[in-house]
């Protein structure tokens, strides 16, 4: 209703012969234009109308030199090492760090080796809590029999200058498999945070979205992880954001799998 009132008429100076807005008398000019009147309820003019304020499209004209809550870096997987400083709020995306020669090469090789490691699948692969996907049981002796896994971990160590403290082999058998939003243990266990300040994940197989959820306002963002892609997150990202793997909607279901190799460890960060 307030937008139908001619603000220029209220001000006493509308010059349009056929104005498309209403020229209404007895409106309180101060209340209409400023949403306040010093006379309050005693004002003899009408307080039923006030102009709608348009939000400003720019609110801060001072440069802000703070680093963002999340800073995303895109890195070259063809390089021998990551060539930038790593910051506590970094997420680093690396394309084809393992330089695989054809699609699904590492996916197929990893599955072949872990199936041939000598441990029955029902003993080796355990459901992650929540029963959302499978992980290889680290308590069993399989890693030395999966040389491609050790090759990948070594590449992670060398590329990021990382001291790897623990690892994981995840298997998402189809697009129904997913991982809920969560923090890695270093976010809330000081004894782990002493030697783990960075998570590195490399994906093989079908493209899936990794996503982050900000603690304060639940804002989310997602980053597609293609075959061979790496994403990392540093100390503050793990504390301030949860992360997970989104489930694909049922109508887009595919019986295609994804493997992710995770390394947790320590990297010098600014």
PLM regions and their residue ranges:
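Non-heme Fe(II) oxygenase metal-center motifs and adjacent flexible, charged/small-residue loops
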Residues: 54-270
């Amino acid at each position: 209703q307030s937008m139908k009132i001619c603000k220029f008429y209220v001000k006493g100076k509308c010059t349009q012969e056929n104005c498309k807005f209403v020229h209404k008398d007895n409106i309180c000019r101060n209340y209409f234009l400023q949403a306040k009147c010093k006379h309050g309820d005693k004002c003899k003019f009408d307080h039923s109308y006030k102009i709608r304020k348009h939000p400003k499209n720019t609110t801060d004209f001072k440069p802000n030199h703070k680093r963002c809550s999340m800073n995303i870096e895109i890195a070259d997987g063809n390089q021998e090492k990551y060539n930038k400083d790593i910051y506590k709020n970094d997420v680093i995306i690396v394309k084809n760090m393992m330089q695989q020669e054809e699609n699904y090469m590492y996916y197929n090789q990893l599955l072949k080796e872990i199936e041939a490691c000598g441990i029955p699948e029902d003993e080796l692969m355990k459901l992650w809590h929540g029963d959302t996907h499978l992980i290889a049981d680290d308590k069993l002796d399989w890693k030395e029999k999966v040389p491609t896994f050790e090759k990948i971990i070594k590449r992670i160590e060398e590329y990021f200058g990382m001291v790897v403290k623990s690892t994981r082999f995840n298997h998402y058998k189809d697009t129904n498999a997913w991982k809920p939003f969560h923090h890695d243990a270093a976010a809330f266990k000081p004894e782990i945070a002493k030697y783990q300040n960075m998570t590195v994940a490399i994906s093989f197989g079908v493209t899936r979205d990794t996503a982050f959820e900000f603690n304060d306002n639940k804002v989310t963002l997602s980053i597609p992880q293609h075959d061979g892609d790496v994403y990392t997150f540093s100390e503050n990202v793990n504390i301030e954001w949860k992360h997970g793997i989104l489930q694909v909607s049922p109508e887009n279901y595919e019986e295609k799998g994804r493997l992710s190799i995770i390394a947790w460890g320590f990297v010098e960060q600014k």
